Amino acid sequence: MAVARLAAVAAWVPCRSWGWAAVPFGPHRGLSVLLARIPQRAPRWLPACRQKTSLSFLNRPDLPNLAYKKLKGKSPGIIFIPGYLSYMNGTKALAIEEFCKSLGHACIRFDYSGVGSSDGNSEESTLGKWRKDVLSIIDDLADGPQILVGSSLGGWLMLHAAIARPEKVVALIGVATAADTLVTKFNQLPVELKKEVEMKGVWSMPSKYSEEGVYNVQYSFIKEAEHHCLLHSPIPVNCPIRLLHGMKDDIVPWHTSMQVADRVLSTDVDVILRKHSDHRMREKADIQLLVYTIDDLIDKLSTIVN
């Protein structure tokens, strides 16, 4: 019932330039408070209220420099971890940054090595290298406790980050979490096709989200990713976890989020399914649910600290 109510609400937590009346957040801005508020008028969409943050680079000895944008603010901070070959300037990343700005919380978004504005060669990318990228962002840029928001493959990496940095990662939000998915999908291919991919060195994976109609995934990326699979055993993550997934997702089955929920050791886990959402989950209602979830976790963590 709660999920259906969320999906039906048209409200949005405003930034000032949207022209809403100010929403007075008390010491505990819970999700129930947000849902109880009715907007005076529908907001203009995200681009109307964007305020640019400058592009910076994290210099790393012997590793590619990472492009990032950091919004300073209070804790917990939010780090957005993008999907496969996705950039930091996607709809979800920008919406999260704007939401954090409205609350005064810190936010970091970045490009993986070999992707977007970061240094490196995408054909040499591996999941292990991107895992190091995420840990570099957490270790070198993030101050204090962090909530990680992982989209698709970024959801897989957020779990690894939570395992590696339990003292700093205090909550997780997965959007179409693609834990093990690339390896699982490859292993489901016919034997003949897998041999062909091995010979060519590239898997042309069909995708309606690519302009070319396929994602060209390096065979080396798939084989290296096998070393990072998580769903075969309990996942040692104990922080609060929220997993959002669209039931129309034809890339990562929503059952994957159920598997993650079952495998993690945390007892504070919610899986929220949206009946008509697809893999990208970037429609207005999807973004609303995402920022509501972030706000509720911030409220929950503040309550625990206090």
UniProtKB/Swiss-Prot annotation:
The keyword Plastid does not apply. GO terms for biological process: protein depalmitoylation; xenobiotic metabolic process. It comes from the Eukaryota. Its EC number is 3.1.2.22, 3.1.1.93. It is found in: Mitochondrion. It catalyses: S-hexadecanoyl-L-cysteinyl-[protein] + H2O = L-cysteinyl-[protein] + hexadecanoate + H(+); mycophenolic acid O-acyl-beta-D-glucuronide + H2O = mycophenolate + D-glucuronate + H(+). It is an enzyme of class 3 (hydrolase). Disulfide bonds: none annotated. GO terms for cellular component: cytosol; mitochondrial matrix; mitochondrion. The active site is at residues 152, 249, 279. Pfam families: Abhydrolase_1. Residues 1-52 form a transit peptide. GO terms for molecular function: hydrolase activity, hydrolyzing O-glycosyl compounds; mycophenolic acid acyl-glucuronide esterase activity; palmitoyl-(protein) hydrolase activity. Inhibited by palmostatin-B. Keywords: Hydrolase, Mitochondrion, Transit peptide. PANTHER family: MYCOPHENOLIC ACID ACYL-GLUCURONIDE ESTERASE, MITOCHONDRIAL, PALMITOYL-PROTEIN THIOESTERASE ABHD10, MITOCHONDRIAL. Belongs to the AB hydrolase superfamily. Acts as an acyl-protein thioesterase that hydrolyzes fatty acids from acylated residues in proteins. Regulates the mitochondrial S-depalmitoylation of the nucleophilic active site residue of peroxiredoxin-5/PRDX5, a key antioxidant protein, therefore modulating mitochondrial antioxidant ability. Also catalyzes the deglucuronidation of mycophenolic acid acyl-glucuronide, an active metabolite of the immunosuppressant drug mycophenolate. This is Palmitoyl-protein thioesterase ABHD10, mitochondrial.
